């Protein structure tokens, strides 16, 4: 029993002290266990010792209810590892700085001793060779320069890491010696054994851990990419701007409501792919404008020429033959004039293709709102006249100066035709003029290199246009057998009068003179007056019918009057069933456009 207990007691030894010391609380002589003489036995002492050892071992191995150990995330964190590495590097640099201080003090002491020995060697007789003295001087100069480079400041150490590493690594290669003295005092010239032995007396402990210090210098000072690869980053102060890869993948963030994608330069080929991830409202309009801008001028001309068609009241739609490139301009224009009818429509604007603007959806909405405001105001007032409409249109045009005046006037003209304030013949004639002007603009756009050659053609086209316009006006008026047809340079503008009218009063209004009236009767066949002002208004007032006003202005009709020009009025009387008076205005060498009649 005692043997087994003794073996067990020796196997379980206390961790807090040596096994054979029974002093203090381990002794049973001075505590409550010492009751009788049996407690003085060795077995009893060992038993108490074992119980106490187990008790204290349990206390020492007890764990806290709260886990205070280092979390796993800290050990796996890259940031924490970088911080620990930086702290370790700082400690190593501080230790290296202390070592440099020690080496500096040791080198100063050696420098004093070496300077004394050098002074003694320089006092030798002149018969000895001077090569050894020169070598000693060179070695001393190298030693002093190396001592100056060893500055204990951390900044100087941090900046000169690469240079010192070069010195340390290149030293053993040149001298093929493992001693630190040969590394420190590497000279350019040949070395003698005496000088090597002189400087090699320094103990090895003055420059410890040279290999470890070399590895520390070769490491980066921090784990930051901006510090490791600073040459790849031009300006670190600029803010970070994210970039998107040019891929067809759809971003998951585009499904969110308040997500705005990164902007980048859009190519025409990539715009259709980016349409799924694009959230801007103006994407469709930008795509449409980009497509139209890429089209060439020839494609635009062919596409727009195919849209220009002529409509007849009893004939079907016939497109203009502008698709062939071999046909000349005169043939196209003559053919267009032959096919033109009173209801000819043209879907062009009056601008050439090079300067014609492409309106986006937003601009079209602005023009639609402009027309909507005008129509709403007309409907609110109810009653209106031509003068009132003109004032209303001018006021709205002045209020919308950010829009183009030509397009607004075109829309107002269409609205006026729809309201019935302008006859359809005038609108059709205006469209004919628009079609001819478009042809002229297209010709001007295609004939820019041949400007000198086309000057004569422009005058011929103007004369041809005047002649065709005069023919259209004569065909629209009633004819008589005694009517004289005009020449290509002069034509007559007829004014129709009913048979029930008794007389016509013609008033000539000038800006500087008073009003002059003259009465035309059947007994007076013609009256000639000279025009002294540029703007002339002729008021034709019939006796029985409503008043009609014909205004011929310089801005609308293109009249450039002079004192030499004359106006002739003539009256023609026919049979009893066709009694009429025909007043013709003879205009010499002037371009005429359509003049609207206000009913």
From Swiss-Prot:
Residue numbers spanned by region Disordered: 163-205
Chain intervals with Polar residues compositional bias: 166-175
One CC-aspect GO term: microtubule cytoskeleton
A Pfam family hit: HSD3
UniProt subcellular location: Cytoplasm, Cytoskeleton, Cilium axoneme; Cytoplasm, Cytoskeleton, Cilium basal body; Cytoplasm, Cytoskeleton; Cell projection, Cilium, Photoreceptor outer segment
Keywords: Cell projection, Cytoplasm, Cytoskeleton, Leber congenital amaurosis, Retinitis pigmentosa, Sensory transduction, Vision
Keyword Acetylation: no
Keyword Cytoplasm: yes
GO terms of biological process kind: microtubule cytoskeleton organization; photoreceptor cell maintenance; protein localization to photoreceptor connecting cilium; protein localization to photoreceptor outer segment; visual perception
InterPro entries named among the record's database cross-references: SPATA7 (IPR029357)
Main location: cytoplasm
Subunit note: Found in a complex with CFAP410, NEK1 and SPATA7. Interacts with NEK1. Interacts with RPGRIP1. Interacts with RPGR. Interacts with NPHP4. Interacts with NPHP1. Interacts with AHI1.
Disease note: Leber congenital amaurosis 3: A severe dystrophy of the retina, typically becoming evident in the first years of life. Visual function is usually poor and often accompanied by nystagmus, sluggish or near-absent pupillary responses, photophobia, high hyperopia and keratoconus. Retinitis pigmentosa 94, variable age at onset, autosomal recessive: A form of retinitis pigmentosa, a retinal dystrophy belonging to the group of pigmentary retinopathies. Retinitis pigmentosa is characterized by retinal pigment deposits visible on fundus examination and primary loss of rod photoreceptor cells followed by secondary loss of cone photoreceptors. Patients typically have night vision blindness and loss of midperipheral visual field.
PANTHER family: SPERMATOGENESIS-ASSOCIATED PROTEIN 7
Described function: Involved in the maintenance of both rod and cone photoreceptor cells. It is required for recruitment and proper localization of RPGRIP1 to the photoreceptor connecting cilium (CC), as well as photoreceptor-specific localization of proximal CC proteins at the distal CC. Maintenance of protein localization at the photoreceptor-specific distal CC is essential for normal microtubule stability and to prevent photoreceptor degeneration.
Descriptive protein name: Spermatogenesis-associated protein 7
Encoding gene, per UniProt annotation: SPATA7
